[in-house]
C-alpha cells in the first residue's frame, strides 16, 4: 500500500481536497481518498507533492499508427489527397518506432485511457504492453 498527498487533490467526486491523502494498492489502484480538512499531519511512508494530484486523462481520438507522419503531409488537399498521401508515404517500421514514442509521451502526460483509430494491426502488440488502456477503433479505407 502507498499513500500520497499534495496541496490539492482532485477526485471528480466533489470539491478538491486540500492536503488530502490518496491510498493505493501496490499496482496503483486507488483504495481511498481521505479529506484531512487541510490539516495534514506527518505520517511514515506518506509521499507529499507540492502541487496537485489529478485523475488520469482520457484521449478520445488518437492515430498511433500515423505518429510517424507528423509534419510530412501538407494541408489543404482535402480528404482524398490526405488519404492518398497516407497510403503512399507510410513506412511500417518507422511508424512502429514513432507509435512507441507517442505511447510513452501520452503516458508521461497523464493519459490512462485512449481511443485509437487504426487502419491495420500495426499497433496492437504495442497496446497490449502499454501502461495505457486502449480501445482500438478500426477505420476501413
Which ranges hold each PLM region?
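N-terminal metal-binding scaffold of metallo-dependent hydrolase/deaminase domains
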Residues: 1-41
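Short, flexible, glycine/charge-rich loop motifs used to bind or transfer phosphoryl groups or to couple energy/partner
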Residues: 11-13, 37, 48, 104, ...
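Short, glycine/charged-enriched secondary-structure capping and boundary segments
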Residues: 18-19, 72-75, 129-131
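Conserved beta-strand segments of alpha/beta enzyme cores
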Residues: 29, 44-45, 133
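Active-site loop-helix segments enriched in His/Asp/Glu that coordinate
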Residues: 90-141
Amino acid at each position: 500500500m502507498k499513500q500520497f498527498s499534495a496541496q490539492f487533490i482532485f477526485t471528480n467526486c466533489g470539491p478538491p481536497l486540500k492536503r488530502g491523502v490518496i491510498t493505493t494498492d501496490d499496482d496503483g489502484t486507488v483504495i481511498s481518498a481521505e479529506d484531512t480538512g487541510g490539516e495534514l499531519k506527518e505520517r511514515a511512508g506518506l509521499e507529499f507533492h507540492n502541487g496537485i494530484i489529478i485523475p488520469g486523462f482520457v484521449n478520445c481520438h488518437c492515430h498511433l499508427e500515423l505518429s510517424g507522419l507528423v509534419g510530412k503531409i501538407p494541408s489543404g488537399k482535402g480528404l482524398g489527397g490526405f488519404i492518398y498521401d497516407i497510403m503512399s508515404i507510410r513506412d511500417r517500421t518507422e511508424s512502429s518506432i514513432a507509435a512507441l514514442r507517442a505511447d510513452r509521451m501520452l503516458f508521461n502526460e497523464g493519459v490512462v485511457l485512449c481511443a485509437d483509430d487504426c487502419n491495420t494491426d500495426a499497433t496492437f502488440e504495442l497496446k497490449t504492453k502499454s501502461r495505457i488502456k486502449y480501445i482500438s477503433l478500426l477505420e476501413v479505407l
